């Protein structure tokens, strides 16, 4: 049985990150709000409150987490664009997933995600090759170039969408 935590595998990229790859990743980030909305379409409240795996987050928490994570990423990009290798602040995503706003209707986060991604994608398409080399420093994972971060967050959106779609497949929803 495959690892339900990583339905599309973990993020890895080896090789040169070309303009074509960057464009593909940005397109995936742009598509995420619609893909995530499609993944949860017609789910009822009980289904939204079903964990995607034993010990995992509920579908509702996954949707809210994606927005939390991508808001943080958007800020990290802006920091890297305006400061030299800023040290970003990590957050405890597992604790954020337990906060009261993670019980709100998923539509709240879908609207936020759509608006956030419109702004983020606009910023991403404006990046010049030199901008893609800019970095931020994560206290736990170290220095990250913006080019690689684009790939990581494209993967992140697909990863969590796959949590939901694979659950739907397993349970015949």
UniProtKB/Swiss-Prot annotation:
Residue spans making up a coiled coil are none
What is the protein name for this chain? Putative metal-dependent hydrolase BcerKBAB4_2443
Q: Which family does it belong to?
A: Belongs to the metal hydrolase YfiT family.
Q: Entry's Pfam families?
A: DinB_2
Query: What keywords is this UniProt entry annotated with?
Result: Cytoplasm, Hydrolase, Metal-binding, Zinc
Subcellular location field: Cytoplasm
Summarizing the function annotation, the protein's role is: Possible metal-dependent hydrolase.
Record keyword Chaperone present:
no
Return the cofactor note field.
Binds 1 zinc ion per subunit.
The record's GO CC annotations read: cytoplasm
**Residues the entry annotates as binding Zn(2+):** 65, 156, 160
Looking at the record's lineage, which domain of life comes first? Bacteria
What EC number(s) does its UniProt record assign? 3.-.-.-
Q: Which GO terms describe its molecular function?
A: hydrolase activity; zinc ion binding
Question: Which cofactors does this protein require?
Answer: Zn(2+)
Identify which top EC class this enzyme belongs to.
hydrolase
Q: How does it assemble?
A: Homodimer.
């Amino acid at each position: 049985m495959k690892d339900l935590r990583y339905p599309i595998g973990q993020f890895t990229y080896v090789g040169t990150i070309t303009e074509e790859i960057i464009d593909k990743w940005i397109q995936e980030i742009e598509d995420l709000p619609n893909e995530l909305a499609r993944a949860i379409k017609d789910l009822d409240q009980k289904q939204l409150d079903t964990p995607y795996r034993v010990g995992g987050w509920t579908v509702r928490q996954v949707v809210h987490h994606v927005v939390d994570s991508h808001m943080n990423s958007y800020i990290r990009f802006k920091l890297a664009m305006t400061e030299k290798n800023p040290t970003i602040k990590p957050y405890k995503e597992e604790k954020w997933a337990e906060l009261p706003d993670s019980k709100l209707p998923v539509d709240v986060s879908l609207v936020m995600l759509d608006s956030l991604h419109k702004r983020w994608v606009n910023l991403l398409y404006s990046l010049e090759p030199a901008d893609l080399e800019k970095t931020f420093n994560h206290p736990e994972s170290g220095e990250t170039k913006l080019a690689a971060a684009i790939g990581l967050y494209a993967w992140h959106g697909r990863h969590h969408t796959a949590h939901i779609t694979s659950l739907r497949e397993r349970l015949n929803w």
